[in-house]
Amino acid sequence: MFSRRNLVALGLAATVSAGPCDIYEAGDTPCVAAHSTTRALYSSFSGALYQLQRGSDDTTTTISPLTAGGVADASAQDTFCANTTCLITIIYDQSGNGNHLTQAPPGGFDGPDVDGYDNLASAIGAPVTLNGQKAYGVFMSPGTGYRNNEATGTATGDEPEGMYAVLDGTHYNDACCFDYGNAETSSTDTGAGHMEAIYLGNSTTWGYGAGDGPWIMVDMENNLFSGADEGYNSGDPSISYSFVTAAVKGGADKWAIRGGNAASGSLSTYYSGARPDYSGYNPMSKEGAIILGIGGDNSNGAQGTFYEGVMTSGYPSDDVENSVQENIVAAKYVSGSLVSGPSFTSGEVVSLRVTTPGYTTRYIAHTDTTVNTQVVDDDSSTTLKEEASWTVVTGLANSQCFSFESVDTPGSYIRHYNFELLLNANDGTKQFHEDATFCPQAPLNGEGTSLRSWSYPTRYFRHYDNVLYAASNGGVQTFDSKTSFNNDVSFEIETAFAS
């Protein structure tokens, strides 16, 4: 129970000027790690929120709040990243403990980047506004992960802790494991009870809840728990708001899952009670590393979007968490625009011309299922003109963006598969829709448009050896070469050869 002094302090901390970590501090459960690319989580914080690295010259810079306690300076990012690409290389810890999150190393599973590291996130995949001010979240595709295996002050063993994260309830999958929280220091699976992390997704391999998901669950290692029992727990609802508050806490023989809409309303308790009655979970053996977007053993097949989150020392009360939720709602998260520069109109038919010098007579076309570039002009055959013409439709996975249907093969769309662009029939699956959705942005070379993958925002339409790929600006694939990248990912939008 709170003393009168702490109740008064909590009431003061819940004012608009306070941040989530001020509220936890007033509740005697201070933040030991605080991460956000969108805003300061303390009213007095004015330091760096995150670090960017741009693709043009690999220079880095840091992004801070516009004012102490305020929203991130998105304009500084936009200026730094103009006409190139940017990755988020560090998410800084605001607590003062130095628990920064950096590119996750290999562990039980290798990542897809150099030397088995996980990928870094695009800086522009999750635009939002907070109280009308632009900011960017962390859109994490499969293979993306951040970690700190040498964290300070985080709970170990059976010590009590709490945590929350603001996540996107529309961006998820059923792979392991989109987590934020406490994990192993070795990046390997060291056994049941060695983790305590928030999970959001629709995996049913271990635990699951009511409906089709996604669900907030707790990753305690070797199991995702949605309640007291392994497997199904009806008290854990599907939660698919654009902005989800997920709150988890654990102590000696107790733990809880709470959640709600981060844009309105209060938190609900989905489970609060004793630890799971299975070997390894009571007492717990937490190790104190911090992960984001991955499992404790570096399982990296999951996807999701992270906006802010903290970890605390001590088991926060429901009252404290309720006040934090009020603060989050007061931040007024709203989804931002995924589109910039010249755009498209759903229903129009276009041809897309290469702008790379020496290749400007070539257009995006297809030969059977292979998407490529071919020389096309008014004297070309009707067949080739149709193969180089595309009907623009509203994005199959996101209505802000677009999908491209073949004129000569109705019902088939450009999609990425293993980062090659293919023409495949729409099979109606969530995976296909995500693979076939692309967001136009201001062209990186100033000509036409650049088309960014919605599901892998580090990757763009790129012609390479006359074949189309979803390519990044530098990377492990041959077609990720930085040479001529800006030209190769920029295409002029022209009247279609055929309709």
From Swiss-Prot:
Protein name per UniProt: Probable alpha-L-arabinofuranosidase B
Disulfide-linked positions: 21-31, 81-86, 176-177, 401-439
Region annotated ABD, chain positions: 336-499
Keywords assigned by UniProt, alphabetized: Carbohydrate metabolism, Disulfide bond, Glycoprotein, Glycosidase, Hydrolase, Polysaccharide degradation, Secreted, Signal, Xylan degradation
UniProt keyword Cell inner membrane present: no
Family recorded in the similarity comment: Belongs to the glycosyl hydrolase 54 family.
Alphabetized GO MF terms: alpha-L-arabinofuranosidase activity
Reactions accelerated catalytically: Hydrolysis of terminal non-reducing alpha-L-arabinofuranoside residues in alpha-L-arabinosides
Example GO biological process: arabinan metabolic process
Annotated site location: Cis-peptide bond: 176-177
UniProt keyword NAD, yes or no: no
Any single Pfam family the record assigns to this protein: ArabFuran-catal
Species of provenance: Aspergillus niger (strain ATCC MYA-4892 / CBS 513.88 / FGSC A1513)
Gene name of the encoded protein: abfB
Lineage: Eukaryota, Fungi, Dikarya, Ascomycota, Pezizomycotina
Function of the protein: Alpha-L-arabinofuranosidase involved in the degradation of arabinoxylan, a major component of plant hemicellulose. Able to hydrolyze 1,5-, 1,3- and 1,2-alpha-linkages not only in L-arabinofuranosyl oligosaccharides, but also in polysaccharides containing terminal non-reducing L-arabinofuranoses in side chains, like L-arabinan, arabinogalactan and arabinoxylan.
